[in-house]
């Protein structure tokens, strides 16, 4: 099971859509069923705390015109990884460590997401589209 070692994130944004899920719903093989995600409209000027027990997609714009967002992360988050870390092997994550894309940043991608080949593509189900 994925553990959460970092703190919450704080987001203050223009109107945007935030797609969230629960860390507890990640399967033993680190896959995640996208049907468990929920989309929320966040009105402009609203502060949102995304708890460390949450999964989230990158925020999405509402009107196709883009948006601005300020995200406050725990110190060191998204810094380059230091030391040796496990890698995705033949499409499988041998451990949680293989999901680390940067310091304090675990990544589970979708096959349609355009991620680098070495990324773990464990999002199972429909690639969510907020325009529908």
Predicted feature locations:
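Short histidine-centered beta-strand/loop micro-motifs
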Residues: 8-9, 30-32, 59-61
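Conserved metal-binding segment of the jelly-roll/cupin
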Residues: 42-62, 72-74
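Histidine- and/or cysteine-centered catalytic micro-motif in compact active-site loops
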Residues: 13-14, 21-24, 45, 53-55
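A contiguous catalytic/ligand-binding core that recognizes phosphate-bearing ligands
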Residues: 4, 30-44, 49-51
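Short, surface-exposed beta-edge/turn micro-motifs
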Residues: 15-16, 37, 45-46, 66-67
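Single conserved hydrophobic/aromatic residue that forms the stacking wall/gate
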Residues: 1-7, 11-12
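Accessory, usually C-terminal, subdomains that scaffold auxiliary metal cofactors
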Residues: 61-132
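A short beta-strand-loop-beta hairpin characteristic of the jelly-roll/cupin
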Residues: 16-40, 82
């Amino acid at each position: 099971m994925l553990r959460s070692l970092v703190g919450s994130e704080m987001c203050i944004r223009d109107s945007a859509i935030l797609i969230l899920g629960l860390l507890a719903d990640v399967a033993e093989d680190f896959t995640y069923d996208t049907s468990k995600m929920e989309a929320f409209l966040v009105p402009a000027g609203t502060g949102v705390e995304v708890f460390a027990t949450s999964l989230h997609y990158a925020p999405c714009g509402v009107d196709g015109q883009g948006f601005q967002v300020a995200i406050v992360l725990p110190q060191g988050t998204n810094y380059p990884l230091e030391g040796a870390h496990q890698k995705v092997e033949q499409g499988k994550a041998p451990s949680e460590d293989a999901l680390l894309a940067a310091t304090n940043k675990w990544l589970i991608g979708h096959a349609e997401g355009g991620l680098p080949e070495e990324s773990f593509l464990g999002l199972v189900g429909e690639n969510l589209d907020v325009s529908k």
